[in-house]
Design a protein with these regions (language model features):
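Catalytic loop of short-chain dehydrogenase/reductase
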Residues: 101-105, 109-124, 130, 144-193
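Rossmann-fold cofactor-recognition segment
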Residues: 58-80
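Conserved internal alpha-helix within the Rossmann fold of NAD(P)-dependent oxidoreductases
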Residues: 131-136
Length: 257
């Protein structure tokens, strides 16, 4: 990933070595701050044609809509994506899952094990791990069996067990650790199916979105969603099959699981 480390954070371009085959890109979680920025960046690449001439977006408010609590909605959405690709005579070459949950009416991240709550844990795992697992079930089969393709799941550095020195945020940390394991396991199966496939978990940094807003008020440094999206797409462009199954940050550096 040295190339990604040296690449300008705002320079998402078609790979010079033809690393991407033209095809469709799909962003799931497109209504969120980061997801919307990813769609916008993919849809308007400065300086040249996009390697993804068709950009599809799905969210809870899209048509069709997806609901991680309703697996039938995921199957219906996958069928829609397959039909969209077929009508354009394109293959799905890029899948990005940018959905995530940290806080809301269901609860807040825990500071202590005395604050652990079953309802919050169930919801954070539903959105951050179970939902993406069902995305794998219904959308990974749409990726081609030949040629480069990428499945990227937005994770978080706090999901790293080896990097956990602060504690707290039990549910969020554990759900992202579960996502990382799901990504690793799926990467093994995808490689058997297509040796040029790449399946990774990506840490975007702390992005200025609704997810981070309550914590930005405490002085936590946040990054604009547009910049975070450009950084992630620059990393994606430099990925090789040797990176599959890894957790990487927005600079392309590998993080411990």
């Amino acid at each position: 990933m040295n190339a990604a480390e040296n690449q300008d954070a705002r320079s998402f371009q078609p790979a010079a070595n033809g690393g991407s085959l033209a095809g469709a890109a799909l962003v799931i979680g497109a209504a969120g701050g980061l997801g919307a920025a990813l769609v916008a960046n993919l849809s308007s690449v400065a300086g040249g044609p996009s390697p993804y001439p068709a950009v599809l977006a799905l969210s809870r408010s899209s048509l069709p809509a997806i609901d991680y609590g309703d697996e039938a909605s995921l199957k219906a959405a996958a069928d829609w994506v397959a039909a969209q690709c077929a009508s354009r005579q394109m293959e799905l070459r890029l899948l990005i899952v940018a959905s995530g949950f940290l806080h809301g009416p269901q609860g807040q991240p825990e500071r202590s094990f005395t604050q652990l709550d079953a309802g919050y844990l169930q919801h954070v795992f539903q959105v951050n791990a179970i939902g993406p697992a069902l995305v794998m079930k219904h959308f990974l089969p749409l990726l081609p069996k030949q040629g480069r393709c990428v499945a990227a799941f937005v994770s978080a550095r706090v999901g790293s067990i080896g990097d956990n020195a602060l504690g707290g945020w039990y549910g969020y940390r554990a759900s992202k650790a579960a996502l990382n394991q799901l990504v690793k396991t799926a990467s093994v199966e995808l490689t058997r199916r297509n040796r040029q496939s790449v399946c990774v978990a990506l840490h975007p940094g702390t992005v200025d979105t609704a997810l981070s807003q309550p914590f930005a008020k405490t002085g936590l440094k946040v990054r604009p969603a547009e910049g975070a999206a450009s950084d992630l797409l620059a990393v994606i462009q430099c990925l090789t099959p040797g990176d599959t199954g890894c957790l990487l940050d927005y600079k392309g550096l590998k993080l411990p699981f």
